[in-house]
């Protein structure tokens, strides 16, 4: 019996994603100078304004305003027409040291070894993998994300000069369940809403989106005469970016992960250093789940881990292969526990998470944190661990 499932994505010019990239741009700047920086940086943006706020303890000397403006320019917010001008917008900075109460409990104010560093907070994180794509990611999520990325490519390379930074995509796929494994059959619906300049016709928008975006991304085998296309269905999307909607860090956590598949513990990633297990725990969980599927132990895998603040060892670890495991889940879990060290300090070391700079974390903040095999030097958690 087939069923429909939908995932969405947003472009790097969506205001929430801009906020994520700014928070991670600041994290990069801190870690580049001081790998032991403790960063919890949030960003809010609205018309002609960006505010960064939170807690940062670092030896780095960072011009936070300069970082904010550069990220805005990187994305393409360089004029009022785009929704924000990174060269002249107001930038508010409210950043203070990390609470010493947290510091003494987590890292002993810098005195604890990697083996003893505790989790930066309580929480539970998930990792997910599925054999339906080469990336071992859900196809709905992969296609929605790649459509959004392609929109940015055609904007920046001049193929579609009418495209502006803000945009959203959504893909619905018809699946069949084969003994717990997800098998995509066809694309049911594609939705694209992209910000555009004044004066371009809806006919031109639809033509370019079909020929330069959809046909360049979606494999022909998934499209048929019954596939539905909604291309800028509102009819007008000139006002966008932070001028159209306020943006906040951490509001696109499903887009950042698996597009609604698997599960999510609720914690966002951007602006957080590796002692924050919301981020490092989710990264190692993805690596664990991916390694299970890559090893052929299961066609589909969900991995969960949980922590207490200040405690190094996880409280629980769990594997669910949805009935697709070649061996019992308990045996798979034993293999995972033997191959991974889930203490926060050791996860950071194994995945080289203290290394920032060169837009490492800023790159993760748009177009998904997982399934990014194109650069394993950045996305170290996508490397498969032998089990």
From Swiss-Prot:
The keyword Magnesium applies. K(+) binds at residue 42. Its EC number is 2.5.1.6. It catalyses: L-methionine + ATP + H2O = S-adenosyl-L-methionine + phosphate + diphosphate. Mg(2+) binds at residue 8. One of its GO terms (molecular function) is metal ion binding. PROSITE patterns: ADOMET_SYNTHASE_1 (PS00376), ADOMET_SYNTHASE_2 (PS00377). Its main location: cytoplasm. Binds 2 divalent ions per subunit. The metal ions interact primarily with the substrate. Can utilize magnesium, manganese or cobalt (in vitro). One of its GO terms (biological process) is S-adenosylmethionine biosynthetic process. Its cofactor is Mn(2+); Mg(2+); Co(2+); K(+). It holds the Pfam family S-AdoMet_synt_M. Homotetramer. HAMAP family: S_AdoMet_synth1 (MF_00086). Catalyzes the formation of S-adenosylmethionine from methionine and ATP. The reaction comprises two steps that are both catalyzed by the same enzyme: formation of S-adenosylmethionine (AdoMet) and triphosphate, and subsequent hydrolysis of the triphosphate. This is S-adenosylmethionine synthase. It comes from Ostreococcus lucimarinus (strain CCE9901). The gene is METK-1.
């Amino acid at each position: 019996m087939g069923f429909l499932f939908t995932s969405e994505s947003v472009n790097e010019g969506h205001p929430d994603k801009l906020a994520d990239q700014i928070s991670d741009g600041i994290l990069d700047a801190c870690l580049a100078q001081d790998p032991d920086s403790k960063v919890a940086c949030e960003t809010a943006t609205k018309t002609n304004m960006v505010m960064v706020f939170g807690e940062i303890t670092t030896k780095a000397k960072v011009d936070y305003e300069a970082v904010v403006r550069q990220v805005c320019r990187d994305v393409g917010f360089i004029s009022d027409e785009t929704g924000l001008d990174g060269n002249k917008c107001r930038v508010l900075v409210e950043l203070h040291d990390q609470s010493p109460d947290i510091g003494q409990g987590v890292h002993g104010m810098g005195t604890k070894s990697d083996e003893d560093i505790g989790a930066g907070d309580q929480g539970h994180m998930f990792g997910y993998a599925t054999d339906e794509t080469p990336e071992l990611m859900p196809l709905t999520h992969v296609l929605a994300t790649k459509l959004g990325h392609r929109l940015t490519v055609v904007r920046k390379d001049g193929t579609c000069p009418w495209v502006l930074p803000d945009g959203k995509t959504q893909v619905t796929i018809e699946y069949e369940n084969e003994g717990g494994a997800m098998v995509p059959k066809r694309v049911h619906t594609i939705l694209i809403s992209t910000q555009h300049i004044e004066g371009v016709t809806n006919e031109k928008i639809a033509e370019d989106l079909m020929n330069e975006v959809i046909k360049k991304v979606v494999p022909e085998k998934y499209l048929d005469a019954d596939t539905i296309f909604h291309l800028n269905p509102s009819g007008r999307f000139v006002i966008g970016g932070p001028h159209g909607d306020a943006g906040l860090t951490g509001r696109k956590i499903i887009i950042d992960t698996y597009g609604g598949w698997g599960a999510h513990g609720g914690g966002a990633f951007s602006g957080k250093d590796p002692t924050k297990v919301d981020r490092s725990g989710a990264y190692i969980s993805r690596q664990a789940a991916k390694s299970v599927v890559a090893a052929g132990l299961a066609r589909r895998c969900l991995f969960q881990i949980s922590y207490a603040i200040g405690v190094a060892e996880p409280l629980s670890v769990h594997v669910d292969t949805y009935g697709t495991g070649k061996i019992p889940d308990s045996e798979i879990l034993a293999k995972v526990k033997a191959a991974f060290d889930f203490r926060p300090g050791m996860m950071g070391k194994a995945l080289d998470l203290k290394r920032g700079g060169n837009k490492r974390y800023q790159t993760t903040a748009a177009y998904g944190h997982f399934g990014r095999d194109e650069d394993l030097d950045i996305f170290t958690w996508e490397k498969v661990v032998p089990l």
